[in-house]
From Swiss-Prot:
This is Serine--tRNA ligase. ATP binds at R262, S263, E264, E349, I350, S351, S352. GO terms for molecular function: ATP binding; catalytic activity, acting on a protein; serine-tRNA ligase activity; transferase activity. CDD domains: SerRS_core. Pfam families: Seryl_tRNA_N (PF02403), tRNA-synt_2b (PF00587). It comes from Bacillus velezensis (strain DSM 23117 / BGSC 10A6 / LMG 26770 / FZB42) (Bacillus amyloliquefaciens subsp. plantarum). GO terms for biological process: selenocysteine biosynthetic process; seryl-tRNA aminoacylation.
Length: 425
C-alpha cells in the first residue's frame, strides 16, 4: 500500500509514475473524489457531535431548573439519527477507499528503466559461459526420462498436468540442492532458517500484496478462508504483521524452504513440459526486514547472495533490471536472475529479488522504533528466491548433460549426494 499522505499531496505526480507500470488504474481517479467526500463527512459528523454536546448541556441545565426539556431532547435525538446516518455513509466511503488503496500498485523507484514488456528489461551483468555441445542438447525432461529420475506421466495420472514425481537420484538431487542453498544462506550470510506453514489466511495474502489482485492465481482451501502459499514470502513477511520491531535488531534476515503452489491461471500453453512451470514446486526464499535508508544496499546484497548459488553450481546466468512494465504489482525495484537453458538457447528466470520499500509493511502494519521511545516507522521489506529448486534441477540436467545420456553432478553438491560424481542411465 502506498503512503496516503504522499498520494494526497502529489496525486497527479504519483499517477504519472504509476502509468508506466501498465497496471489497471481504473479506480485510481476515484480516490481523490472519495477522499474529499470522506473529509467532508468527517467534518459534518464532528460538527453535529459538537452540536449534540451543546444540546446535551442545555438539557442538563433545564432539568436542574425543573423546566421542560422535551423539545430539546427531541432535537438531540434527531441530531443523533443524522450522526448515525452520516457514520454509516462514512464507513462505506472508507471501505471503498481501502479497496482502492489495495488495488494501487507500488511506485517504481527512479532507477527503474521505463518500458512496456520484458523486451525493455536491461541486462546488468552476465556470469559464466554457455556450454558448447557437439550435439543437439536435449531438454531436461528427455534427459530425466532416460535417467529414470523424474516421472511426469505418473504424476499426471495421480494428480494432473504440471506435477512431477522425483525419484531415485532425482529426489536426492532436489534434496541436495535445497540443503546446499540453506547451508549457504544460513552459514555464510547469517540468515535465520525458518520452516513456515504452507497455508495462510486472507489477511496474510493481503499483507504481501497477493490479494485482492491475484486471487485467481491462488489455491484456496474449501470451507476455510485459507490459501496454499504461492511462496514462503507470504508467511515469513507476515510473521511480523502488526508488530513494532526494535531498530537495534534490523536487518532481520530469514531463509525458508517450502513447497509453493500456483494455479498458473494465465499460463495456458506455456512451458507445458518439464519443470519450468509447475503447480507445485520447492523453493528457498530469502526475506529481509530493514531500515528504509538501507533497503537499496540490501537489495544488492540479496541479489549477490542469490547469484552466489549459481556461481558455486557453475551455472551460467545473467542479471536483469526489470522495466516499469515488467516490474509487477508490489515491487519498487526488481532484479531477475536468469539461468542458461541450453535446449531453449536462452536464459530463463530462476530468481526474482525485489525491494518493496514500505509497500508491504503498510499493508501488514510492520513498524520499528529507532529508539526505545521513538516514533514507530514502517520497515522496508525485501525478498528473493535463493533459488527455485526445480528450475535449478532443470538447469543442472541441461548444462551438465553428456552425450552418453549421463549428467555430471556439480562439485559443490557431491558431499550432499554421497560423493557421487555422475548420474548414469
Amino acid at each position: 500500500m502506498i503512503d496516503t499522505k504522499v498520494l494526497r499531496a502529489n496525486f497527479q505526480e504519483v499517477k504519472a509514475k504509476l502509468i508506466p507500470k501498465g497496471e489497471d488504474l481504473s479506480d485510481f481517479d476515484k480516490f481523490e473524489e472519495l477522499d474529499e467526500k470522506r473529509r467532508e463527512l468527517i467534518g459534518k459528523v464532528e460538527e453535529l457531535k459538537g452540536k449534540r454536546n451543546e444540546v446535551s448541556q442545555q438539557v442538563a441545565v433545564l432539568k436542574r431548573e425543573k423546566k421542560d426539556a422535551d423539545h430539546i431532547i427531541k432535537e438531540m435525538r434527531e441530531v443523533g439519527e443524522e450522526i448515525k446516518k452520516l457514520d454509516e455513509e462514512l464507513r462505506t466511503v472508507e471501505t471503498t477507499l481501502e479497496t482502492i488503496l489495495l488495488s494501487i500498485p507500488n511506485i517504481p523507484h527512479d532507477s527503474v528503466p521505463v518500458g512496456e514488456t520484458e523486451d525493455d528489461n536491461i541486462e546488468i551483468r552476465k556470469w559464466g559461459e554457455a556450454p558448447a555441445f557437439s550435439y543437439e542438447p536435449k531438454p531436461h525432461w528427455d534427459i530425466a526420462d532416460h535417467l529414470n529420475i523424474l516421472d511426469f506421466e505418473r504424476a499426471s495420472k495421480v494428480t494432473g498436468s504440471r506435477f512431477v514425481f522425483y525419484k531415485g537420484l532425482g529426489a536426492r538431487l532436489e534434496r541436495a540442492l535445497y540443503n546446499f542453498m540453506l547451508d549457504l544462506h544460513v552459514d555464510e550470510y547469517d540468515y535465520t532458517e525458518v520452516i513456515p506453514p504452507y497455508m495462510v489466511n486472507r489477511t496474510s495474502m493481503t499483507g504481501t500484496g497477493q490479494l485482492p489482485k491475484f486471487e485467481e492465481d491462488a489455491f484456496k482451501i474449501r470451507e476455510e478462508d485459507y490459501f496454499l502459499i504461492p511462496t514462503a514470502e507470504v508467511p515469513i513477511t507476515n510473521m511480523h504483521r502488526d508488530e513494532i520491531l526494535s531498530g537495534e535488531n534490523l536487518p532481520i534476515n530469514y531463509a525458508a524452504f517450502s513447497a509453493c503452489f500456483r494455479s498458473e491461471a494465465g499460463s495456458a500453453g506455456r512451458d507445458t513440459r518439464g519443470l519450468i512451470r509447475q503447480h507445485q514446486f520447492n523453493k528457498v526464499e530469502l526475506v529481509k526486514f530493514v531500515k528504509p535508508e538501507d533497503s537499496y544496499e540490501e537489495l544488492e546484497k540479496l541479489t549477490n547472495q542469490a547469484e552466489r548459488v549459481l556461481q558455486l553450481l557453475e551455472l551460467p546466468y545473467r542479471v536483469m533490471s526489470m522495466c516499469t512494465g515488467d516490474l509487477g504489482f508490489t515491487a519498487a525495484k526488481k532484479y531477475d536472475i536468469e539461468v542458461w537453458i541450453p535446449s531453449q538457447d536462452t536464459y530463463r528466470e530462476i530468481s526474482s529479488c525485489s525491494n518493496f520499500e514500505a509497500f508491504q509493511a503498510r499493508r501488514a502494519n510492520i513498524r520499528f522504533r529507532r529508539e526505545a521511545k521513538g516514533k514507530p516507522e514502517h520497515v522496508h521489506t525485501l525478498n528473493g528466491s535463493g533459488l527455485a529448486v526445480g528450475r535449478t534441477v532443470a538447469a543442472i540436467l541441461e548444462n551438465y548433460q553428456q552425450e552418453d545420456g549421463s549428467v555430471i553432478i556439480p562439485k559443490v553438491l557431491r558431499p550432499y549426494m554421497g560423493n557421487k560424481e555422475v548420474i548414469k542411465p
